[in-house]
Amino acid sequence: MRSQYCGDVNKSHVGQEVTLVGWVNRSRDLGGVVFLDLRDREGIVQVVYDPDLPEVFDVASTLRSEFCVQVTGLVRARPDSQVNQDMRTGGIEILGKGLTILNSSAPLPINMDKNQHNTEEQRLKYRYLDLRRPEMADRIVFRSKVTSAVRRFLDDSGFLDIETPILTKATPEGARDYLVPSRTYKGQFFALPQSPQLFKQLLMMSGFDRYYQIVKCFRDEDLRADRQPEFTQIDIETSFMSSEQVMAKTEEMVRGLFNDLLNVDLGEFPKMTFAEAMRRFGSDKPDLRNPLELIDIADIVKEVEFAVFNGPANDPEGRVAVLSIPGGAKLSRKQLDEYAKYVTIYGAKGLAWMKVNDLDQGMEGIQSPVLKFLSEDVVKALLDRTGAQTGDLILFGADKANIVAEAMGALRLKAGEDFDLLQGEWKPLWVVDFPMFERTSDGGLHAMHHPFTAPTGISPEQLEADPTAAISDAYDMVLNGCELGGGSVRIHNSEMQSAVFRILGIEEEEANEKFGFLLEALRYGTPPHAGLAFGLDRIIMLMTGASSIRDVMAFPKTTTAACPLTNAPGFANPAQLIELGIEVIENQESKEEQA
């Protein structure tokens, strides 16, 4: 039905007859000539109909937005004065000779102009229309190019594309599972996988030493801009490769994607330990475009007569750190109060500040509500430590170390945006040497990555003797403050795996019930293996500049995990529930909603 895509017509086709199909993006009658912008997934081209062909012209005059049409015409160059530099096809146009309406369109329920706003609910309800818009179509096409490039790279590197089950068993991976009832085993449930973690490890045990899969995963968790209940991973696992080799191979893949698809050279990725990232940036996924760093000052304020500072400064689990913001002294008291309110979201009790109004005036040039608690020597030491200059602002965080890191790390990002401090377009890095475990709110231990991650260089006995000192052989790839992917060397013997389960409070009976198949498999010559999983949606979001992963998925869910297009989720047929042996118990809230 067509000779090429609309967006592919160019000056090399001048003088040729082409046949195109697509949708009417815009139609206008200017002085007896109809100008038609025809759109398909590859772009937009201008078609011109004049009255010399009255039958065709009359049909063209009836066209409205989103009519689906077939066009035949002659490609001609536009006059220099009419060239549209904003269009890929802006140097040519089609002189229309034929026109067939393949389908008309009802009045549109959403606005297709990119400059007009539609609510997200409207966009998702009429997603098939929303996806016709060039910015959305471009992202979906780009996504396909990324997955094709990933497959080519991994295929060429000897990896095998192997599918793993979707109906599987619940595993403790940090989020709630989506459960699927079994009809044949009444009262029992499958779980949709949060990742193919255990199956890809079993594939290593099966001898398939290089595996990958572009796979759907499911997590029933609270949603944010970068979260969806179903999402796509680039899942990779290898045998007989060290963490350094896995990082090198996957870095090569990502650098290739950016180079081939965006013409961007990311360069070699620097490595940073978890401890350094938390100390300098308050985050294990630091945005290195932001030049601000957390500066420790506990040693300076240990002796001050101000409990807010000296308490955490003398507490082994406390921390006192500052951010020095160039030009920040111009902030009003109201703006500083907003910053103070902002850090309370992350557990901080408040935010002290100091303005350096005039460095040459000594203490007279310093303004701060806590200045009365600080001696001139302390203030001088603070200024020396931070390198603050006239016009700068110093913000203080003092609390437990984890609260200071989280609150000041978040404030660092906010200040970087507010003061337009971000430098460079792309700043990748590897974060390595994570702790094996972290403390939970009830004082227990939780695996920082997952319970199948191997520690670095210790025995099971040493691990159990001091689990909080253990460092995992894990690594995260971070770009512009977003975690692109994370992975680790896996535990490959049953003694170490059992030790980790015991540390996590998983007793032998529970371990055998949930992971008996894994512990059994580990007894039969399991090779050393390691892997990594990338969040495909997040990679596409970053590469296309989208503000949400919902804008790079064809049919995403809302932030409440619903689909306005299909009205999913919905109520099940009572007969199906009976067959499954399920009874729905209504809570008071749902009864009130139905009333």
Swiss-Prot record:
Task: Indicate whether Lipoprotein appears among the record's keywords.
Answer: no
| Residues engaged in binding ATP | R219, D220, E221, Q228, E483, G535, L536, D537, R538
The UniProt catalytic activity note for this protein reads: tRNA(Asp) + L-aspartate + ATP = L-aspartyl-tRNA(Asp) + AMP + diphosphate
Q: Does the keyword Nucleotide-binding apply?
A: yes
Its EC number is 6.1.1.12
Q: Where in the cell is it found?
A: Cytoplasm
Q: Where does L-aspartate bind?
A: E173, R219, H449, R490
Q: Which HAMAP family match?
A: Asp_tRNA_synth_type1 (MF_00044)
Q: What is the name listed in the Swiss-Prot or TrEMBL entry for this protein?
A: Aspartate--tRNA ligase
Give the species this sequence originates from: Shewanella woodyi (strain ATCC 51908 / MS32)
The opening ranks of the lineage are: Bacteria, Pseudomonadati, Pseudomonadota, Gammaproteobacteria, Alteromonadales
* GN (gene name): aspS
